[in-house]
Amino acid sequence: MAQNIHDHRILILDFGSQYTQLIARRVREIGVYCEIKAFDITDDELNEFNPKGIILAGGPESVTQLGGPRAPEGLFDRGIPVLGICYGMQTMAEQLGGRVASSEKREFGYAQVKVRAKGPLLADITDHLTPAGDSLLDVWMSHGDKVVAMPEGFELLASTESAPIAAMQDLSRNLYGVQFHPEVTHTLQGKRILEHFVLTISGCEALWTPAKIVDDAVRQIREQVGSDKVLLGLSGGVDSSVTAALLHKAIGDQLTCVFVDNGLLRLHEGDQVMDMFASNMGVKVIRVDAEDLFLSKLKGVNDPEQKRKIIGNTFIDVFDDEAANIKDVNWLAQGTIYPDVIESAASKTGKAHVIKSHHNVGGLPETMKMKLVEPLRELFKDEVRKIGLELGLPYDMVYRHPFPGPGLGVRILGEVKKEYADILRRADAIFLEELHRADLYHKTSQAFAVFLPVKSVGVVGDARRYEYVIAIRAVETVDFMTARWARLPYELLETVSNRIINEISGVSRVTYDISSKPPATIEWE
């Protein structure tokens, strides 16, 4: 029998760092399953999870303050290898009898650490050598406190000028701490450091691969739903598309997809979804044309948050009505992914702050007495894409730019009208077509057009035109937490502008959005 791909696993304890999910993604990239849990995990939860290694992530608090988060009591006495990163190293030091103090000189950004001792964590890793032959590593720091005295049993592993104890180790107990962040790309050898901890020190095998993930998911789906029928709301987005392909591989005709065309999709998107899933893959897809219903509900509504809620609730109503017509369905499938699970858990602690409400089915309506199947709930977005390719979905579908759940409803500023949606659909298609032609689509992280409900004077021939304005936006980002506007060639922008104005009746002006995030968000609403 094949080995369970979850058998070799790493536990990441979250102390509130913005980088915690990045650590998990790096561990998964190494080929090892991991999960993020809150720092105050119980003994029973720890025993049940049974990790081969534990990583203590960073956090915004100070170890020097009373009442700050700490690792669970007895964690370091379990005989399980532990790696503390930044705050994780500091709380390890403090809890084991060392000392942490505020730095006179804070370290934020690039630093060079000198390796001071031999050990498996930094073995054979170097970026530069000193004249004396000592190893130097280029790393990324982000800390205001520092360890000033190591606990008993630890030795100095690395140092910088402003952090004399930049890394430490207790080889007898397999405890390691690094003040820098190996999970970020600025730490050049960060992936190798994490590999050493995960594979060498913790003894994990790299079982977490796309092919094995698909096989495991198919097995789990079959075990979970048996011979029951499953219903999925198919949007055409990456998550729902991969969910559909995975379910279809697992249970075939037991799956029925409902595709709600709300009139707020991209140009020809509805037909493309039907061609891909119904025609090419043989998936049962029911297409519901609900454009008139959505537009009538949105009439006169200007507030973006209200628009999001109306679109989300109307989707549930339409989906609910359609589901009622399908007999003997026991399961509802959703494309929930791991960051959704983490954020949902964070919101229950009361520490999350909603900037925009995120559109999803968002749970089962009371009237739908179905059980939930979420085959992607363990996966990060980059893993979902790899699974999509493994399942045979086209590259352009799997790696298409993000599209908001409410669709063009939040790319039309103010009230949504059919006229506006038709104009925007065509403008957006022209922009993306030209990006593809210039081989720049996959070099930008997200690109789209926005409809501005203001009119501007233009001139065509001898005639004045008083027509609408289209804004185009393209950004580059690693994590969508921050983003810079894409420096697209002027010639490309000129072509896009000329085509939109000449080919679309009703547009007299095109602008390019050069706002970065922060302070602006990527989407306009």
Swiss-Prot record:
Gene Ontology molecular-function annotations: ATP binding; GMP synthase activity
Catalyzed chemical reaction(s): XMP + L-glutamine + ATP + H2O = GMP + L-glutamate + AMP + diphosphate + 2 H(+)
EC number: 6.3.5.2
GO cellular component, one term: cytosol
Domain GMPS ATP-PPase: 208-400
Domain Glutamine amidotransferase type-1 span(s) in chain numbering: 9-207
Keyword Ligase: yes
Parts forming coiled coils: none
Record CDD domains: GATase1_GMP_Synthase, GMP_synthase_C
Residues that, per the record, bind ATP: S235, G236, G237, V238, D239, S240, S241
SUPFAM superfamilies: Adenine nucleotide alpha hydrolases-like, Class I glutamine amidotransferase-like, GMP synthetase C-terminal dimerisation domain
Alphabetic keyword roster: ATP-binding, Glutamine amidotransferase, GMP biosynthesis, Ligase, Nucleotide-binding, Purine biosynthesis
UniProt entry tagged with the keyword ATP-binding: yes
Pfam families, A to Z: GATase (PF00117), GMP_synt_C (PF00958), NAD_synthase (PF02540)
Enzyme class: ligase
Pathway: Purine metabolism; GMP biosynthesis; GMP from XMP (L-Gln route): step 1/1
Active site: C86 (nucleophile), H181, E183
Function of the molecule: Catalyzes the synthesis of GMP from XMP.
Subunit structure: Homodimer.
Protein name, as recorded: GMP synthase [glutamine-hydrolyzing]
Gene name of the encoded protein: guaA
